[in-house]
Amino acid sequence: MRLHELYPFDEERKQRKRVGRGSGSGWGCTSGKGNKGQNARSGGGVRPGFEGGQMPLQRRLPKRGFKNYLFKARYEVINLGQLVGAFEGKTEITLDDIYARGLARAGAAVKVLGNGECNVAVKVEAHKFSASAVEKIQKAGGEAKALEG
């Protein structure tokens, strides 16, 4: 017998509650919904935040600040060790190479972070670099070329 073959006995399984099946069941008549009203009807109930027609709290409170997330620059981050490991033996790594290897989604802005080691002189193209990544690339004799956009 295997773990996926185990199952509880029929009498141990809890039956689902079937409402509206006679008063003897304890859930007959109004089926636990109370008497009349919007909540007793099929599809009844109000949407979250609805306060019965009075001005809801969300609209009574003033707006504050601004929403910067609409204009925030989003970068796909790649660590330096990951980048150098994926392109061993290559001296120049372009954005197209990064996209082709699947390290970032095609067309996405790429930022290279300095986690990992860079032992070979390599020329790397990306939209942004962290200070530690630039330092490690230059220390190994390579070049970090930041692109615009």
Curated annotation (Swiss-Prot):
Region ranges (Disordered): 14-57
UniProt keywords, alphabetically: Ribonucleoprotein, Ribosomal protein, RNA-binding, rRNA-binding
Gene Ontology terms, MF aspect: rRNA binding; structural constituent of ribosome
Subunit (UniProt): Part of the 50S ribosomal subunit.
Pfam family, one: Ribosomal_L27A
Biological function: Binds to the 23S rRNA.
Family: Belongs to the universal ribosomal protein uL15 family.
InterPro entries recorded: Ribosomal_uL15 (IPR030878), Ribosomal_uL15/eL18 (IPR021131), Ribosomal_uL15/eL18_sf (IPR036227), Ribosomal_uL15_bac-type (IPR005749)
Single biological process term from Gene Ontology: translation
GO cellular component terms, A-Z: cytosolic large ribosomal subunit
Compositionally biased spans, kind Gly residues: 21-35, 42-52
Domain of life: Bacteria
Protein name: Large ribosomal subunit protein uL15
Naturally occurring in which organism (per UniProt): Oleidesulfovibrio alaskensis (strain ATCC BAA-1058 / DSM 17464 / G20) (Desulfovibrio alaskensis)
